[in-house]
Amino acid sequence: MEKRLRLAPSPTGLLHIGTARTALFNWLYAKKTNGKFFIRIEDTDIVRSKSEYTTNILDGLNWLGLSWDEEPIKQSKRISIYKKNIKKLLEIGAAYRCFTSESEISELREKQKSSGLPPRHDNRHRNLTSNEIKAFLSQGRSSVIRFKIDDETEIKWEDQIRGEIKWKGRDLGGDLVLSRRALGDEIGDPLYNLAVVVDDNFMNITHVVRGEDHISNTAKQILIYKALNFKLPIFSHTPLILNSEGKKLSKRDCVTSIDEFREMGYLPEALANYMAFLGWSIKDSESEILSLKEISRVFNLSDINKAGAKFNWEKLNWINSQYIKQMELTKLRQLIKNYWDDMGWESPSAEWDLKLINLIRDSMLLLKDAIDQSKPFFTLSQMQKEGEEFLNNKDETRESLKYILCYLKEENISTIDSNKAKEIIHKISVENSIKKGILMKSLRVAFFGCLSGPDLIQSWELFSENKSDITLIERCLI
């Protein structure tokens, strides 16, 4: 039988890292089993759902490389279908109209709270007579539709990640609301638990993979599946993503949306690679750098951990740096060039760009690191304290720079490649009895304003090509 999986996000915000990982796990299992992966947009909350969030979610999934089969389904287009199923539940006696007002519910909650009881509805209108219903309707009372949940009912299923899970009806908060309020004999707009069941059945979903925060929803939904005589899918509940303190990752942890990761300079391949290991581990593998295709070959839902997965920034940064190091230079240039363009920096040539990127990429964790790493090659570096001290405390330093400057001007050298740079340093060192180390440190201070930086010889070649090496040396001799 074909495996059919889905992601069902609500477009009430930007694509979250947790939603993206859920999408990834569904996508990986679909690929592993030659199944299908679908998108369903759960936009029945008209007030909070925004089309721009739908666009953001789909764009984010595309960016991560998570393609889907068929056009996404939108729940807002299927309201009448949900209402038909609610009507069916009413007809078979599995659901009923509840006229409890908001103020009555608030009063009930306060009593339960003061008594130290968990919040749950008291099902007070489950057995209303037809005359009582008519009386409420004549008063103009609005109603919701509630699904009957017997306190003694036991719900259990075999979860592919957690094994057998059991719930008692009494632990589900009372009879479940299926629809929003409506007047008269109308049925209000459907709510999450009803719509999900109807859609998963309609889409022939065979496997539901979602976060552990949905476990109680699964218990409720199983009862609706059975009442509507729908075939149950196989359920899997993934662990939550936790922050460094072991609490659920939230917006308070600064970065949670895929847009933010993208803007920070994470590569989609790296982020997807890292997300796969957030709660899942691969057996007998020496490498943690794996493409989605490679991961899909060995992925199994049963290998996902039950315990929460702590988000590790250092690990993500390391994985991202490996992808930067491995990326084809011309492709990496296209990405980094965007940052340079935003800074208003212009380079002498595409070839020069490639040389610079090759020089700095081993020091980059994120794409945006290219700004700081390449800044000295586009703008004059400020002289730092250690650079000033080196210039002022060693007589040989300024002498070294004078010799280099004179040589460049006397020989009328316009550009310098790596071999020429080494030749000049060797020649001046021998002819003037100056240690090569002093010469190279002096040049480094001239170029970068400090004693650290990328490879000096390759750097000199780049400074020479953009005609700034002489200017940088001269500023140290003023």
Curated annotation (Swiss-Prot):
- Source taxon at top rank: Bacteria
The record lists the catalysed reaction(s) as: tRNA(Glu) + L-glutamate + ATP = L-glutamyl-tRNA(Glu) + AMP + diphosphate
What EC number(s) are associated with this protein in UniProt?
A: 6.1.1.17
Return the GO cellular component terms, semicolon-separated: cytosol
The top EC class is: ligase
State a single Pfam family of this protein. tRNA-synt_1c
> Residue numbers of motif 'HIGH' region?
9-19
Q: What is its main location?
A: cytoplasm
UniProt keyword list? Aminoacyl-tRNA synthetase, ATP-binding, Cytoplasm, Ligase, Nucleotide-binding, Protein biosynthesis
Give residue numbers for sequence motif 'KMSKS' region.
Answer: 248-252
GO MF annotations in UniProt: ATP binding; glutamate-tRNA ligase activity; tRNA binding; zinc ion binding
Query: InterPro entries under this entry?
Result: aa-tRNA-synth_I_cd-bd (IPR045462), aa-tRNA-synth_I_codon-bd_sub2 (IPR020751), aa-tRNA-synth_I_CS (IPR001412), aa_tRNA-synth_I_cd-bd_sf (IPR008925), Glu-tRNA-ligase_bac/mito (IPR004527), Glu-tRNA-synth_I_codon-bd_sub1 (IPR020752), Glu/Gln-tRNA-synth (IPR000924), Glu/Gln-tRNA-synth_Ib_cat-dom (IPR020058)
Compartment(s): Cytoplasm
One GO biological-process annotation of the entry reads: glutamyl-tRNA aminoacylation
For this protein, the record's Gene3D superfamilies field holds: 1.10.10.350, Glutamate-tRNA synthetase, class I, anticodon-binding domain 1, Glutamyl-trna Synthetase, Domain 2, Glutamyl-tRNA Synthetase, Domain 3, HUPs
**Positions with a binding annotation for ATP:** 251
- Role: Catalyzes the attachment of glutamate to tRNA(Glu) in a two-step reaction: glutamate is first activated by ATP to form Glu-AMP and then transferred to the acceptor end of tRNA(Glu).
The family this protein is said to belong to: Belongs to the class-I aminoacyl-tRNA synthetase family. Glutamate--tRNA ligase type 1 subfamily.
HAMAP family linked to this entry: Glu_tRNA_synth_type1
Its assembly, as annotated, is: Monomer.
Specify the protein name. Answer: Glutamate--tRNA ligase
What organism does this protein naturally occur in?
Prochlorococcus marinus (strain MIT 9515)
